[in-house]
Amino acid sequence: MTQVTLHTSAGDITVELFDDRAPRTVENFLNLARHDPAADADPAPDTVTWEDPETGEVRGDSLYEGAEFHRIIEDFMIQGGDPTGTGRGGPGYEFDDEFHDDLGHDGAGKLSMANSGPDTNGSQFFITLDAQPHLDGKHAVFGEVAEGMDVVEDIGATPTGRGDEPLDEMLVESVTVHDD
C-alpha cells in the first residue's frame, strides 16, 4: 500500500492509502499531492493538473503543499485540502463517491473525503479524531494514519474561532509520496 507523509507545521503525519479498495479516490489524492513538472510546461489532458479556484489558472504543482487545515472540530476531525482555505474551494472538478463495506469511520485516524453531498468529492479531506460511524456511506474512507496520530491530536486540540477555523495557522508545508 502507498504511504504519504504530510509534513505539517505541527509535525509529520504519515497515512497509509487503501489503493486496493478505494482506487479512484487514492489516485485523486496522489495526483493532487504530487507535482507534475510536465503540467507546468504544458497543462495537457494527459498531465496531472488542477484549476486554481481564485485565479482560474491550470496548475501542475501539489495542491496540498501550502494548504491549511482550515476546519478543526475537537474530538471530531481536522479538515484540509482546500486551496482557498475557506472550506469552499477545490480542484476545479468533482468525482463520484467510492464506498467499501469494510471501510468505515470506526476509530481515530481515518482519512476520508470531505464533500458537500453525494458525488461531490474534490480535494478536501479530513482525519477523524474519534469514531464517527454516522459518516459511513456519506464520506469515503480511503486511508488511515500509520504514524503521527499525536500530531493529528495536537492539531485537533488547536483553539478555534468562528466557523471552526483555527486561531493559529496549521499548514501542510510539503508532501512526500512513498511509492511501493
Predicted regions: what is each one?
Residues 1-180:
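Cyclophilin-like peptidyl-prolyl cis-trans isomerases
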